[in-house]
A protein has these predicted regions:
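Extended substrate-binding grooves/exosites of carbohydrate-active enzymes
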Residues: 1-183
């Protein structure tokens, strides 16, 4: 069964005005097509903030420049961020997500959807539920080590509605791995 729709996962455009408007348009379109189900988008809160500073995976300017410079230097993309997480450990994303600028760069996008999809944002749940009394949170990506902690929070707070844990998979790859800009 379809329980909700998602407009994307780890799309860093949601840190920009253009991306927030796109998120709103996609949500409205899905509501017109099916008004019975909520809409979410999985946002990696910390990476969304980095994107707002020009360090994100995608941007119009970066795409144009990458096309020109593809042979000059390695692109910073999904592969880079996965390697960074491997070096720094899982906690850096969760802790980074608690920074005030991360809230500033996600609040407008979250306001355009029915369910806020938090990728690795478990350390924000309690704070954000107080700050945004109408927000419903979905753990759209969570580390295995946080599964029990998540369940305990969800038992206490009905606005935390579910969780997707990266546990094991038949890896088909990140959306960008293997694209023309990678090695």
């Amino acid at each position: 069964s379809v329980i909700m729709y998602s407009t994307g996962n780890e799309v860093s455009e949601t840190a920009q005005k253009k991306g927030i408007k796109l998120c709103e348009n996609l949500t409205e379109t899905l509501h017109v097509l099916d008004g019975t189900r909520p809409v979410t988008c999985g946002i990696n809160i910390f990476f969304n903030f980095l994107s707002s500073m020009g360090l994100g995976v995608y941007s119009d300017k970066k795409a144009d420049q990458t096309a020109k410079d593809v042979k000059k230097k390695k692109s910073v993309g999904s592969e880079f961020f996965n390697e960074l997480a491997g070096v720094l450990g899982a906690d850096f994303m969760k802790t980074g997500a608690t920074l005030y600028p991360c809230d500033v760069k996600t609040k407008d996008a979250f306001a355009k959807m029915d369910v806020a999809g938090y990728n690795y944002g478990i350390k924000r749940y309690r704070h954000d539920l107080k700050k945004y009394p109408n927000r419903i949170i979905l753990g759209s990506e969570t580390f295995c080590a946080d599964a029990y902690k998540f369940i305990e929070m969800a038992k206490e707070e009905p606005r935390i509605i579910g969780d997707f844990v990266w546990a094991g998979m038949d890896y088909l790859g990140e959306v960008g791995i293997g694209s023309w800009e990678y090695k």
